[in-house]
Amino acid sequence: MAKPTAPCFEDVLGCQAALYEWAESYDTKDWDRLAQCIAPTLRIDYRAFLNKLWEEMPAPEFLLMASDLKFLGNRRLKTQHFVGGASKWLQTSEDEITGQHQMRVAHQKYADDALSEVALKGHAHGHATIWYRRVEGQWRFAGIEPGIRWSEYDHDRIFFEGEEKLGEPQSDECAC
């Protein structure tokens, strides 16, 4: 495909189904469900909050990262990935589509396993570029790049432990 085009309605529906499964699996911490909706390799650009880009992360590594106790696997962390109704879709090849989605992601971390006391809140507002790939006839979640425009509360502290384990150190040097 030489020039990106608008995908057909059925392909958009397939991508929306993958997007829904991705968001729900994150929020319910259902890692088997996540495994069913992802592509064999993913582009994960978490520079917005982990300062890390994985150009081609194998699905098993992605599942390990997502379910890590320092990341979304922490049972004291509750999330809600809201995807806005205003989305843009571009078909970049026969088996690849890029979606641009409005996002709000709420995070709440609890002080105890009984989830009785909120220790930290942090919500991110913005958009996400999400890549989809058709694998054996089914559209799959193939990567994400969040774009955080603004945040509420202590969003920068939600994944502090995850940034230490999974991310890259921040550099004050100019990359000019």
Curated annotation (Swiss-Prot):
Q: Which SUPFAM superfamilies match?
A: NTF2-like
GO BP, one example? melanin metabolic process
A Pfam short name: Scytalone_dh
InterPro entries under this entry? NTF2-like_dom_sf, Scytalone_dehydratase, Scytalone_dh
Q: Indicate which residues the UniProt annotation says bind substrate.
A: 26, 46
User: What keywords would UniProt list here?
Assistant: Lyase
Its pathway, per UniProt, is: Secondary metabolite biosynthesis
Gene this protein is translated from: AacuK
What is its biotechnological use? Secalonic acids show unprecedented anticancer activities against various human cancer cells and might be interesting for further derivatization, targeting diseases such as cancer.
Query: What are the EC numbers?
Result: 4.2.1.-
Q: Please identify the protein, giving its name as recorded.
A: Scytalone dehydratase-like protein AacuK
Q: Which residues form the active site?
A: 81, 107
At the top level, the lineage of the source is: Eukaryota
- UniProt similarity note: Belongs to the scytalone dehydratase family.
Q: Name one GO molecular function term.
A: scytalone dehydratase activity
Q: What does this protein do?
A: Scytalone dehydratase-like protein; part of the gene cluster that mediates the biosynthesis of the tetrahydroxanthone dimer secalonic acid D. The pathway begins with the synthesis of atrochrysone thioester by the polyketide synthase AacuL. The atrochrysone carboxyl ACP thioesterase AacuM then breaks the thioester bond and releases the atrochrysone carboxylic acid from AacuL. Atrochrysone carboxylic acid is decarboxylated by the decarboxylase AacuI, and oxidized by the anthrone oxygenase AacuG to yield emodin. Emodin is then reduced to emodin hydroquinone by a yet unidentified oxidoreductase.
